[in-house]
Swiss-Prot record:
This is Beta-defensin 1. The gene is DEFB1. It comes from Trachypithecus obscurus. Keywords: Antibiotic, Antimicrobial, Defensin, Disulfide bond, Membrane, Secreted, Signal. GO terms for molecular function: CCR6 chemokine receptor binding; identical protein binding. Monomer. Homodimer. Has bactericidal activity. May act as a ligand for C-C chemokine receptor CCR6. Positively regulates the sperm motility and bactericidal activity in a CCR6-dependent manner. Binds to CCR6 and triggers Ca2+ mobilization in the sperm which is important for its motility. Belongs to the beta-defensin family. Disulfide bonds join 37-66, 44-59, 49-67. One of its GO terms (cellular component) is extracellular space. It holds the Pfam family Defensin_beta.
Amino acid sequence: MRTSYLLLFTLCLLMSEMASGDNFLTGLGHRSDHYNCVRSGGQCLYSACPIYTKIQGTCYHGKAKCCK
């Protein structure tokens, strides 16, 4: 009986994830913009980019700039 409740709970969690457009199944293989910025040698800043750097992209879903 306990395992059936556990399976039902797991199924409900999966269905709730699928209801929202951004779930773990669509996110497989995709890296966050923050990860890509830092990996390419940049840094994420909410303010303007420092002197002698330029904007290479965005971070935190477009809320910050990736400066490199």
